[in-house]
Design a protein with these regions (language model features):
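Short beta-strand segments in beta-sandwich/barrel cores
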Residues: 27, 36, 54-59, 100-101
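Glycine- and acidic-residue-biased ligand/ion/polar-headgroup-sensing regions
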Residues: 34, 45-57, 74-75
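Short phosphate-coordinating micro-motif centered on Lys-Gly-acidic
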Residues: 37-42
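Residues that scaffold the ATP/ADP-binding catalytic core of kinase and kinase-like folds
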Residues: 58, 80-81, 112, 153, ...
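Short, Lys/Arg-enriched N-terminal segment that forms or immediately precedes the first helix
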Residues: 129-140
Length: 188
């Protein structure tokens, strides 16, 4: 998908001049399976949006265990590891499959946000959606049983269980891989 189509259909920018300006700063990037978009602690140099493929956000806990924070699967999903675009990343973002992202150099993205309120509205909308998704996840993790969490995952991320390592799914759902395996067997 080319940048102009993305900013017309996926993340709509109504004003044609502004859309052309943002599209001209954007480039489609290919990530190999296993490649990192950003690592925890690094400052992002690009503002990226998922076009195709699967991304995983994760961090290491105090024991060095890999904890899956989020999955990116939908076209248009921002691949943003922190709310402040100029802050060090709080998570690493890794491609779990061959992946395409649309990227804008961070300096240009920040400049555009500083000078055009229309883009601030779009950014605020993306932040709201992200907050809603993270609060939904937090509610699911802390108010539902392991089986209910797994069923929520299957509904929210259809088909993803067959595309990613089950260890990542178990971590995301705050359960052991053994528990996830038992739940999968129970639903067969």
């Amino acid at each position: 998908m080319d940048p102009n189509t993305f900013f017309t259909k996926i993340l709509p920018i109504q004003d044609e001049v502004l859309r052309a300006q943002v599209a001209s700063l954007s480039q489609v990037r290919e990530l190999d399976k296993g490649a990192f978009l950003v690592r925890e602690g690094e400052t992002m140099t690009q503002l990226s949006f998922l076009l195709s493929g699967i991304l995983r956000g994760f961090f290491l806990d105090y024991n060095g265990r890999d904890i899956t924070d989020c999955f990116g699967v939908r076209c248009g999903t921002p691949a943003v590891p922190t709310f402040r675009l100029d802050a060090p990343s709080t998570i690493s973002i890794q491609a779990l499959t061959e992946t395409q992202v649309l990227s804008i150099p961070m300096a240009e993205a920040l400049d555009l946000l500083e000078h055009d309120v229309r883009l601030v509205y779009i950014y605020n909308h993306l932040l709201q959606v992200s907050m809603e998704e993270h609060w939904q996840l937090k509610t699911v993790l802390h108010k539902r049983s392991a089986m209910e969490r797994y069923q929520w995952f299957l509904e929210t991320y259809p088909g993803l269980i067959d595309q990613v390592t089950h260890r990542y799914v178990a971590s995301f759902l705050e359960m052991s891989p053994v528990t996830l395996s038992r739940l999968r067997s129970a639903l067969r």
